[in-house]
Regions:
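Glycine/serine-rich phosphate-binding loop and adjoining beta1-alpha1 elements at the start
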Residues: 1-38, 104, 112, 122-162
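Structural signal for hydrophobic packing residues in well-ordered secondary-structure cores
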Residues: 10, 21-28, 63, 78-82, ...
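Catalytic cores of large soluble enzymes that bind and process phosphate-bearing ligands
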Residues: 12-16, 54, 63, 88-95, ...
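N-terminal Rossmann-like dinucleotide/flavin-binding domain of flavoprotein oxidoreductases
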Residues: 20, 81-128
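Extended interfacial segments that mediate partner engagement and assembly in macromolecular machines
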Residues: 27-65, 82
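Rossmann-like dinucleotide/flavin-binding elements
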Residues: 48-72, 112-123, 139-141, 157-198
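Glycine-rich FAD pyrophosphate-binding loop
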Residues: 67-83
């Protein structure tokens, strides 16, 4: 949005903010920049439930404010939808892992494969002062489709998980993708890459 209002446009062209952010992000990874923690430790402990974009972002900012931060996530890898719902050609795993590692190096502890079922019990057991819920966008809104045994139906996140875990997903020669958002487009492109018609 700020690019459209950039006064540089009156001279030549607006500043490509996305390209500037990309360059800085690449430099941070390539030169292994570390985040400097300047705030005094508060002695407060915060539990974040969910290691997706929201949870990781909250951990980054809370740690910079001087709080002790732990993240619990039911998944086997941090990143949430960035890990399970964005194809590698859009966001390579190495880049995502590097960004997550920068947060871990700040002193944020991430506990994986751990599902929180009782928030108050976890808060008390871990002596946390606050809990931030960042459970994200993993819920599936399934539609009911009539089908026979020759038709295979799956949801986008299950499909992405199969692809991300390097297991070959079951794909028929002709595939119907139900949906019209970015996720449907990602799925369609991936299906084409596997050699099927979408």
């Amino acid at each position: 949005p700020c690019e459209t209002g950039c006064n540089r446009n009156h001279i030549d062209t607006t500043i490509n903010i996305h390209a500037v952010e990309r360059y800085i992000g690449d430099e941070a990874i390539n030169k292994q920049w570390e985040v400097k923690l300047t705030a005094k430790p508060t002695g407060k402990r915060v539990l974040i439930v969910g290691a997706g974009p929201g949870g990781l972002s909250a951990a980054y900012h809370l740690k910079r404010m001087g709080h002790d931060v732990e993240i619990y996530d039911a998944g086997s890898h941090p990143g949430g939808l960035l890990w399970t719902g964005v194809p590698d050609y859009r966001l390579p795993k190495e880049i995502l892992d590097a960004e997550i590692n920068r947060i871990v190096k700040m002193g944020v502890n991430i506990r994986l494969n751990y599902k929180v079922t009782d928030i108050l019990t976890e808060k008390d057991a871990g002596n946390f002062d606050a809990v931030y819920l960042a459970i994200g966008a993993q819920l599936i809104h399934a539609e009911e489709f009539p089908q026979d045994r020759s038709v295979y139906i799956t949801d986008a996140f299950s499909f992405f998980n199969e692809v991300k875990s390097n297991t070959s997903p079951y794909i028929q020669k002709k595939v119907v993708v139900y949906g019209g958002g970015k996720l449907a487009l990602y799925i369609s492109r991936m299906i084409k890459r596997f050699g099927s018609d979408a």
